[in-house]
């Protein structure tokens, strides 16, 4: 064997990929909310369900609350609205509990990344936004307007 026979040269290949980001003006509030909930889920900053959300709101740990409009328990709606008003936490209402459950990660993803077996969710509170993003800025801007 030669002196260099066992050594293999390693070549690093670096590819630059340009990704076109959507302009903040073209992102709707609903899309921004979906992105913020996804980032909060990754950073373990979501309180899912009425029990966890009401605890987070009562402790004033919640930065944002999302409530389902079609919640059949009127007492739940009054409780969440009162806790949000007391702590001055922004409240967003969503029409479908299945959509909110999908955004909050209460589903199983198939091989293609499509949500299956989605569980409905009545309330979600964001306790940690995770990293700063354009979607978060758009959402916070919509609250101040």
UniProtKB/Swiss-Prot annotation:
Xref: InterPro entries: Ribosomal_eL30-like_sf, Ribosomal_eL8/eL30/eS12/Gad45, Ribosomal_eS12, Ribosomal_eS12_CS
Its keywords, alphabetically, are:
Cytoplasm, Ribonucleoprotein, Ribosomal protein
* Residue ranges of the TM segments: none
Give the Pfam families listed for this entry: Ribosomal_L7Ae
UniProt-annotated location(s): Cytoplasm
Q: Where's it mainly located?
A: cytoplasm
The terms under GO molecular function for this entry are:
structural constituent of ribosome
Q: What's in the GO CC field?
A: cytosolic small ribosomal subunit
User: What biological-process GO terms show up in the record?
Assistant: cytoplasmic translation; maintenance of translational fidelity; ribosomal small subunit biogenesis
Query: What function does this protein fulfil?
Result: Component of the ribosome, a large ribonucleoprotein complex responsible for the synthesis of proteins in the cell. The small ribosomal subunit (SSU) binds messenger RNAs (mRNAs) and translates the encoded message by selecting cognate aminoacyl-transfer RNA (tRNA) molecules. The large subunit (LSU) contains the ribosomal catalytic site termed the peptidyl transferase center (PTC), which catalyzes the formation of peptide bonds, thereby polymerizing the amino acids delivered by tRNAs into a polypeptide chain.
Quaternary structure (record):
Component of the small ribosomal subunit (SSU). Mature yeast ribosomes consist of a small (40S) and a large (60S) subunit. The 40S small subunit contains 1 molecule of ribosomal RNA (18S rRNA) and at least 33 different proteins. The large 60S subunit contains 3 rRNA molecules (25S, 5.8S and 5S rRNA) and at least 46 different proteins.
Instruction: Identify its protein family.
Output: Belongs to the eukaryotic ribosomal protein eS12 family.
Tell me more from the record.
There are 2 genes for eS12 in S.pombe.
What is this protein identified as? Small ribosomal subunit protein eS12A
Organism of provenance: Schizosaccharomyces pombe (strain 972 / ATCC 24843)
């Amino acid at each position: 064997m030669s002196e260099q026979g066992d050594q293999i040269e390693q070549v690093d290949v670096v590819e630059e990929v340009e990704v076109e980001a959507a302009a903040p003006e073209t992102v709707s509030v609903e899309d921004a909310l979906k992105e913020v909930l996804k980032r909060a889920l990754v950073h373990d900053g979501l309180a899912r369900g009425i029990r966890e959300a009401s605890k987070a709101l009562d402790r004033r740990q919640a930065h944002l609350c999302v409530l389902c409009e079609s919640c059949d328990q009127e007492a739940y709606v009054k409780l969440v609205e009162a806790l949000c008003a007391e702590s001055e936490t922004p409240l967003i209402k969503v029409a479908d509990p299945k959509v909110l459950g999908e955004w909050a990660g209460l589903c199983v993803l198939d091989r293609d990344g499509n949500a299956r077996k989605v569980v409905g969710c009545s309330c979600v509170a964001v306790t940690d936004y995770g990293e700063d993003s354009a979607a978060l800025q758009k959402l916070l801007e919509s609250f101040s307007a």
